[in-house]
């Protein structure tokens, strides 16, 4: 119970932040076939109940493949896009129609079996996507395979205003009445861009983007994507990553890659600080900056446990407010996770590095080194020649970074007179 209460408390800022936001969610056909599909639907209904404006885009690739196989037809692709002749288009229409009904039925069933019962959740679809043929590429005619020409932004917006979930299928219609087979990733990306969505959420088989060693990459800038696309080649994660980057370049603040196979992956990504997938964003999710008076409360939360352990000298709120200009901080999505302060020492060309602290959950990301570099740069800018640090627990860390053992007698008089002999802090210094 305590874990649940703590989770809810930590999630509450995100619940408030996501209310009335527009999220475009892309779920491929593989995700619909997966045993976790029911949990994903439940989580989508939960998001809707929390005031999120939802547009759900579904895929249909494995379902199309099954219908082609049943009819003895061979799938044809070029550059990872299906070539859609008339028999294939018939399979596409059959698969998409069946999936729409299945998704609507599951959303309705989940509503009746959850606290949302009686909330009149509505799922709305329609001819919201106008398409055009891809045409001939490299001498290959794509026939009834198309690309998104336009999203009916106003029509979708009206349905979202009426608190409906909008369901978009990977089909588009031309002004002349033709039907085109579309890539669900393209539909989702264009919908997110044209609707000016707050988020694009892309489901895949993996937890997110993995590096060459299989480690999850938690955050990327769009300009970092090209190297990963080259490594991934035709892998489906590459398609998702490309879609995420395109959306961000076109103004969508954040795109997320999450797993359809992991129960709760969507909620973990949206309602925890570090998420569980890969975030692609132009925004600086974590930033190193100088502290302001508004940061005093967050600083107190960070340093208080270390003060209680005797690692840091205790500072009152009044002292922090008075000395806030000395602090540099690392802020991660609104939370202060690290800090350090520089105090120039009167009547000398030396300064003191003090109150270097990093949240225990973030102590292996090099943030202490970043803060040390920032403090040293600030000291040099002030014309200081020597940086002192007094510590009781972290002597080895500072020695590994160029600080040499020193003594109280080496401190400038203004600082030596304040030395606390009860703490018996060790003194180190570093020439700048």
From Swiss-Prot:
Key word Disulfide bond present: no
**Predominant localisation class:** cytoplasm
Q: Which Gene Ontology cellular-component terms appear in the entry?
A: cytoplasm
Q: What keyword terms does UniProt attach to this protein?
A: Acyltransferase, Amino-acid biosynthesis, Arginine biosynthesis, Cytoplasm, Transferase
State its Enzyme Commission number(s).
Answer: 2.3.1.1
How far does the signal peptide extend, from start to end residue? none
Q: Which GO terms describe its molecular function?
A: L-glutamate N-acetyltransferase activity
What pathway is it annotated to? Answer: Amino-acid biosynthesis; L-arginine biosynthesis; N(2)-acetyl-L-ornithine from L-glutamate: step 1/4
Domain N-acetyltransferase residue range list: 286-425
This protein's source sits in the domain of life called: Bacteria
Swiss-Prot/TrEMBL catalytic activity: L-glutamate + acetyl-CoA = N-acetyl-L-glutamate + CoA + H(+)
Location relative to the cell: Cytoplasm
Q: Which Gene3D superfamilies match?
A: 3.40.630.30, Acetylglutamate kinase-like (3.40.1160.10)
GO BP, one example?
A: L-arginine biosynthetic process
NCBIfam families with a match to the protein in the record: N-Ac-Glu-synth, PRK05279.1
- Family listed: Belongs to the acetyltransferase family. ArgA subfamily.
Q: What is this protein called?
A: Amino-acid acetyltransferase
Q: Please give the organism.
A: Azotobacter vinelandii (strain DJ / ATCC BAA-1303)
């Amino acid at each position: 119970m305590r874990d649940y209460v703590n989770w809810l408390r930590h999630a509450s800022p995100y619940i408030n932040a996501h209310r009335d936001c527009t999220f475009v969610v892309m779920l491929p056909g593989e995700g619909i076939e997966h045993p976790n599909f029911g949990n994903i639907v439940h989580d989508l209904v939960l998001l809707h109940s929390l005031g999120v404006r939802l547009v759900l885009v579904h895929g249909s690739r494995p379902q199309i493949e099954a219908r082609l196989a049943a009819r003895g037809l061979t799938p044809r692709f070029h550059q990872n896009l299906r070539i859609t002749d008339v028999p294939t288009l018939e399979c596409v229409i059959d698969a998409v129609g069946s999936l729409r009904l299945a998704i609507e039925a599951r959303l309705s069933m989940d509503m009746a079996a959850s606290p949302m019962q009686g909330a009149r959740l509505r799922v709305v679809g329609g001819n919201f996507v106008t398409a055009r043929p891809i045409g001939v590429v490299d001498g290959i005619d794509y026939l009834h395979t198309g690309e998104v020409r336009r999203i009916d932004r106003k029509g979708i917006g009206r349905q979202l205003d009426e608190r409906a979930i909008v369901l978009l299928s990977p089909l588009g219609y031309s002004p002349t009445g033709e039907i085109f087979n579309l890539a669900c990733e393209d539909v989702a990306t264009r919908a997110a861009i044209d609707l000016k969505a707050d988020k694009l959420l892309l489901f895949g088989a993996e937890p997110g983007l993995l590096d060459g060693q299989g480690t999850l990459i938690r955050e990327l800038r769009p300009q970092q994507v090209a190297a990963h696309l080259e490594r991934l080649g035709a892998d489906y994660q590459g398609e998702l990553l490309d879609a995420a980057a395109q959306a961000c370049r076109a103004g969508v603040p954040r795109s997320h890659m999450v797993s359809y196979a992991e129960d709760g992956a969507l909620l973990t990504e949206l309602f925890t600080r570090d998420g569980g997938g890969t975030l692609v964003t132009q925004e600086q999710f974590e930033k190193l900056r100088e502290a302001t008076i508004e940061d005093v409360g967050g600083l107190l939360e960070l340093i208080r446990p270390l003060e209680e352990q005797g690692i840091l000298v205790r500072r009152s709120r009044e002292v922090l407010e008075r000395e806030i200009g000395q602090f540099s901080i690392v802020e991660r999505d609104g939370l202060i996770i690290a800090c350090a302060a520089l105090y120039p020492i009167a009547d000398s060309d030396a300064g003191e590095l003090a109150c270097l602290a990093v949240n225990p959950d973030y102590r292996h990301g090099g943030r202490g080194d970043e803060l040390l570099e920032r403090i040293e740069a600030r000291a040099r800018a002030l014309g200081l020649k020597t940086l002192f640090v007094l510590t009781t627990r972290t002597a080895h860390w500072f020695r590994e970074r160029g600080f040499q053992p020193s003594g109280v007698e080496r401190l400038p008089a203004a600082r030596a007179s304040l030395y606390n002999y009860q703490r018996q802090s060790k003194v180190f210094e570093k020439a700048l």
